[in-house]
Structures are given as structure tokens and as C-alpha cells.
From Swiss-Prot:
GO CC terms: nucleus
Family affiliation: Belongs to the velvet family.
PANTHER family in the cross-refs: SPORE DEVELOPMENT REGULATOR VOSA, VELVET COMPLEX SUBUNIT B
UniProt lineage: Eukaryota, Fungi, Dikarya, Basidiomycota, Agaricomycotina
Stimuli inducing this protein: Expression is up-regulated during fruiting body formation.
Protein name: Probable velvet family sexual development regulator CC1G_12219
Main location: nucleus
Lineage top rank: taxon: Eukaryota
Function: Velvet-domain-containing protein that probably acts as a positive regulator of sexual development.
Subcellular location per the Swiss-Prot or TrEMBL entry: Nucleus
Organism: Coprinopsis cinerea (strain Okayama-7 / 130 / ATCC MYA-4618 / FGSC 9003) (Inky cap fungus)
Length: 165
């Protein structure tokens, strides 16, 4: 069995048939340098993708490849691959179904202390349900009367609060 066949077989076992869609659902930095950290008294090289996002809803497995860019010639931007591994399966929710953020793990907090650019959350942030949402201001689409300044200011405050300002 060739290396490519083994990779395809592994991906098939985890999430079904391999994705053949040529559209890349990833957004952000897909190529990074490692961070040297100390975790549980041991030093480790960790590759933390702090700003990587998936644009599509569904179940995914990421493939990680390590290349030594100093060892290769880089002809046509291709460097020899030193190692390949796969991450665990994960689910990307639609905006409507997203349950909220979990509190950061100890690993994430350690990465932040050692200089990796990751988001750290002390507490779980749940998504507000419709009962908790601020009431919407209802008004006709077209009006000849001047807008009430209090309603405009109140809706502006709510918009900024939702946007995180």
C-alpha cells in the first residue's frame, strides 16, 4: 500500500469518502512556524494555528504536513515533506446552530503564556436564546415623521453591544 493510499484509507475510516471538491474551506494562516513551550515539565514544539477558520458547515479532519524549508530547493514552491499526520474529527456549526464557546483548556492557556497567538476565554460563553435577546424596535419602512432620537440611540447601543464594542 502506497503512502497516498494509506492516507486516503485513514481519511475514509474517519469521515467517509475523501472530499473531492476543489474549493478550499480554510481561511487564515495555513502555514506556520512551531512554538517551543514547556508543558507538564517537558519541552515540546507545538504548531498552534491561532487564526485558522473553516468557512463551511460540516464534519472535517485536518491533515498536517511538516516540511523543512531550509533543506529543500523549493523549486516551483515545493519542499520535501518530512512528516504527515491527521487531527481528530471536528464539527463546524452553522451560525444558527452554534452553541457558544467553551472555556479555554490548560493547553490553550499555556500556549498563550509562551507567546502563541491564541484566543483565551476564562469562562464559557453560551449563545443567547431568543428569550434573552433584546426586543426589536418595530417601525414602518417609510415614514414622514422624524425619528425619535432615543430609539435611534438605543438601537445603536444594542448594535454595538452585539458587535462587541
Amino acid at each position: 500500500m502506497s503512502n497516498t493510499d494509506a492516507q486516503t484509507s485513514f481519511a475514509s475510516l474517519v469521515v467517509g469518502p475523501p472530499v473531492t471538491d476543489p474549493i478550499n474551506p480554510l481561511m487564515g494562516a495555513t502555514s506556520i512556524s512551531p512554538n517551543l513551550i514547556e508543558l507538564h515539565g517537558r519541552k515540546a514544539l507545538v504548531f498552534a494555528f491561532g487564526n485558522l477558520a473553516v468557512r463551511a458547515e460540516g464534519d472535517f479532519v485536518l491533515r498536517y504536513r511538516v516540511a523543512d524549508i531550509l533543506a529543500g530547493t523549493g523549486i516551483d514552491g515545493v519542499f520535501p515533506i518530512q512528516a504527515i499526520c491527521y487531527g481528530g474529527p471536528f464539527h463546524v456549526f452553522s451560525t444558527k446552530d452554534f452553541p457558544g464557546y467553551e472555556a479555554s483548556t490548560e493547553l490553550t492557556k499555556t500556549l498563550s503564556v509562551w507567546g502563541a497567538q491564541v484566543n483565551v476565554r476564562e469562562h464559557r460563553r453560551r449563545r443567547r436564546g431568543k428569550k434573552d435577546a433584546a426586543p426589536a424596535v418595530t417601525k414602518p419602512l417609510y415614514t414622514t415623521a422624524p425619528l425619535d432620537r432615543d430609539i435611534v440611540a438605543d438601537s445603536e447601543r444594542r448594535r454595538r453591544r452585539r458587535a462587541g464594542y
